[in-house]
Regions:
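Bacterial N-terminal signal peptides
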Residues: 1-9
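Extracellular/lumen-exposed scaffold segments
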Residues: 11-148
């Protein structure tokens, strides 16, 4: 299984509580599977609900990819969340804070066209501080790739 070539990429745009950084370029071979590590950074004193929030009314962290391009999106692997108690909730919540990584998996079909491309992802999240939660936001993640 191929992995990613790391370092700078495009950060999520806008006045956000979260930034997401994809590898600089993913190199993929036809007929294989590849993984891209997406580095996520949450502003200090904030957290986001995990991909499996504690209550149904909370909005989960979710990464989706726009259809198109040579790569076929697969599973997204999330880190283990922490259970934290906050003033605005009667029970602990499943959250992420600080810096962590998501791993996005892709299949590269045997007939995929060779050459460069860009996958566009949307990372939806609900940010909270110690007192309250805010309306959900979406950060764009752009993943450059090259099929060989």
């Amino acid at each position: 299984m191929a992995t990613f070539l790391c370092l700078p990429s495009l950060w999520a745009q806008g006045n956000q509580y979260l930034m997401a950084e994809a590898p600089q370029k993913l190199v993929a071979k036809r007929g294989t599977s590849v993984e891209a590590k997406i580095a996520v950074s949450i502003e200090p004193n904030f957290h986001v609900n995990s991909n499996t929030p504690s209550d149904a009314y909370l909005i989960p962290l979710k990464l989706t990819w726009t259809a198109g391009g040579a790569l076929e999106p697969g599973e997204v692997v999330f880190p283990k969340a922490r259970m934290e108690k906050y003033e605005f909730s009667d029970k602990p919540l499943s959250v992420y804070s600080g810096d962590f990584d998501l791993v996005a998996k892709f299949k590269v079909p045997a007939g995929a066209p060779q050459g460069p491309g860009i996958m566009v992802g949307k990372l939806r999240y609900q940010a909270c501080n110690n007192n309250s939660c805010f309306p959900p936001k979406t950060a764009e993640v752009r993943l450059s790739y090259s099929v060989q």
